[in-house]
Amino acid sequence: MIDLLVILVSLLFGVVWYEKQLQTRIKIKEHFTILQPPPVIAAECPGSTTPWCVSNLDLANTSCQWFKKETTIKNLLGPANPKTLIPPVMVPRITDQSEWATDNYKLHSAINQTHSRALDYLADGQTTASCSSSPPLVYSSFNSNCCDGVKQGETHPLTVYDPRSVGGCTNPSRCFIDPVVGQPRYYYDDVNVTRAPNYITRNKLDTFSFGQTTGRLSNPNCLSDRPSINQLAVDHFHDNILQYRSSLMDSFRCKTQARSDQLRQFPISTNGQLAASGGSKV
């Protein structure tokens, strides 16, 4: 009889232990997953009943405590003023979705990072858990905000059509009749830039014989090294200075020689006139 009672008590404890383990497994399966957040009760979250991969607009203006948490900044602000009963103002960030979603004069910044990490700040409507997304089953084209640069080809002057070469004023927005001479005048600055470049040179060494001028740009790898170009520029500058000084000396010498020849052929004579000081003026 005692053995039977011990067996029944053992079975009872075994059933209780099994039920407890089963409830623990169900709880872990429902509330603890790696990919999904814990389930949310619909009564606590009137804004959205499906918090898994919902849009940011659906999360705005919700009172669900799972989406919000007590951050460090809110703890630093403290309670309301006991005299005025006005709580401290917490300035929202530029990425605060509840601010830009409800205001027609604000636009959400898609460039700035939406998840701020400063002092555990969490804007209204943001979630602490990451939202995973899967690619669509059917491929569809989309407009990307990231644009690659378009390489512009070279425009040859011969390929640019200039209607002024055949006469006539076909485009009234590009031409007008000069009231003085009565001839058509054109606004073709873009054509002039291509066919007759405004800038004749590309660098400060264009006046030198070794500098590049208009035309196709040379390969930088084929040019001589930079120190030699600098030395050529310095030598050319010194030569220009010496040439300028020599030209000044030659011009003054020629002027003095011409004046001497003039005085030799036609000397200045005063005919014995007396100067104001009483001396003779030669």
Swiss-Prot record:
<feature type="signal peptide">
    <location>
        <begin position="1"/>
        <end position="18"/>
    </location>
</feature>
<comment type="similarity">
    <text>Belongs to the IIV-6 213R family.</text>
</comment>
<protein>
    <recommendedName>
        <fullName>Uncharacterized protein 051L</fullName>
    </recommendedName>
</protein>
<keyword id="KW-0732">Signal</keyword>
